[in-house]
């Protein structure tokens, strides 16, 4: 079974995503659905476990529909030895407010919450526990652990963690926005990408010279080839104030001619391009990369020594 690092302890949404990816047979070389979860105390630690060989893969959150992309994941992918995405899954996220058996809402004075979770239940807490004192947790499951060990009265956690720690729920399905979802990635050391499926995503990190028009020029490589960008986001390079790297997601696979040509052009144009992978999403997008055009077919025929077709005579 594949060793897969994830943000622990047992019972986090990340563990649930890991098990879903494994059950779907999306772990390269381990399509039997088996996985050996390896809990760690942060997302960067999960990715470092892959880099050091302590784990074969890591399952990490990349973005949620409430707060957007998760900076620790982005930064960890861009800095350090290269890693590659091989699969993804998206989970509907709703939380449980849990206490020890026999504790009621009136008894709750302190509550542990992972910062990302706290942001997604802020309105509920204001309405139902307005005077509660918030304590940080390093994950949703860690909040449940704090309740079980008597460090706090209540926690915002996952149903999986509540069951693991045998806690009682004050409320289930808690989330301020009913469409709250989180996307998770399966990441390993670089290798051959999964085969093209027709519903794929390709991602890269671009480091671009700080000159006028440089970003526009890079983005034009996608637009001129009819490639649909689904995300562009900047993060500081940490090398100096005002210097940024750009995370790009697009529809398509490196096996698509248009995507491959765009990546080659970016490699020529940018100071650095870090390929993060091409992988199946299971989602059908409106704009798929165009197939090889007539010019590409013509060029391939020349390379193969095939005669050019005679042009049609004018009428």
Curated annotation (Swiss-Prot):
Entry-linked SUPFAM superfamilies: ACT-like, Periplasmic binding protein-like II
Keywords: Amino-acid biosynthesis, Aromatic amino acid biosynthesis, Lyase, Phenylalanine biosynthesis
EC nos: 4.2.1.51
Sequence ranges assigned to domain ACT in this UniProt record: 203-280
A single Gene Ontology CC term: cytoplasm
Enzyme class: lyase
GO molecular function annotations of the record: prephenate dehydratase activity; protein homodimerization activity
Pathway annotation from the record: Amino-acid biosynthesis; L-phenylalanine biosynthesis; phenylpyruvate from prephenate: step 1/1
Domain Prephenate dehydratase span(s) in chain numbering: 3-189
Pfam families the UniProt entry points to: ACT (PF01842), PDT (PF00800)
Spans traversing the lipid bilayer: none
InterPro entries xrefs: ACT-like_dom_sf (IPR045865), ACT_dom (IPR002912), Chor_mutase/pphenate_deHydtase (IPR008242), Preph_deHydtase (IPR001086), Preph_deHydtase_CS (IPR018528)
Domain of life the protein comes from: Bacteria
Biological process terms in GO annotation: L-phenylalanine biosynthetic process
Annotated site (Essential for activity): 182
Catalysed reactions listed for this entry: prephenate + H(+) = 3-phenylpyruvate + CO2 + H2O
Keyword Amino-acid biosynthesis tagged: yes
Record bears the keyword Lyase: yes
Subunit relationships: Homodimer.
Name this polypeptide is given: Prephenate dehydratase
């Amino acid at each position: 079974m594949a060793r897969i690092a994830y943000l622990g302890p047992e019972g986090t949404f990340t563990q649930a995503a890991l098990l879903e990816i494994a059950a779907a047979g999306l772990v390269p070389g381990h399509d039997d659905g088996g996985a050996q979860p390896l809990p760690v105390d942060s997302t960067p630690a999960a990715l470092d476990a892959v880099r050091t060989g302590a784990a074969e893969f890591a399952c990490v959150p990349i973005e949620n529909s409430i707060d957007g992309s998760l900076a620790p994941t982005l930064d960890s992918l861009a800095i350090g030895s290269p890693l590659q995405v091989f699969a993804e899954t998206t989970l509907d996220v709703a939380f449980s407010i849990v206490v020890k058996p026999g504790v009621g809402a009136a008894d709750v004075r302190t509550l542990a919450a992972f910062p990302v979770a706290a942001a997604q239940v802020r309105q509920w807490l204001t309405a139902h526990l307005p005077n509660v004192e918030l304590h940080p947790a390093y994950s949703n499951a860690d909040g449940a652990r704090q309740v079980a060990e008597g460090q706090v009265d209540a926690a915002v956690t996952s149903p999986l963690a509540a069951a693991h720690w045998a806690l009682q729920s004050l409320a289930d399905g808690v989330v301020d926005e009913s469409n709250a979802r989180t996307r998770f990635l399966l990441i390993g050391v670089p290798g051959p990408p999964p085969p093209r499926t027709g519903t794929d995503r390709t991602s890269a990190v671009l480091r671009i010279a700080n000159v006028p028009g440089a970003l526009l020029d890079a983005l034009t490589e996608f637009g001129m080839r009819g490639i649909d960008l689904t995300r562009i986001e900047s993060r500081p390079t940490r090398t100096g104030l005002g210097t940024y790297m750009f995370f790009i997601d697009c529809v398509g696979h490196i096996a698509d001619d248009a995507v491959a040509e765009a990546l080659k052009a970016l490699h020529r144009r940018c100071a650095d391009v870090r390929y993060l992978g091409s992988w199946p999403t299971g989602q059908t997008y409106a704009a798929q990369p165009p197939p090889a055009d007539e010019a590409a077919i013509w060029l391939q025929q020349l390379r193969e020594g095939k005669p050019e077709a005679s042009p049609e005579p004018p009428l």
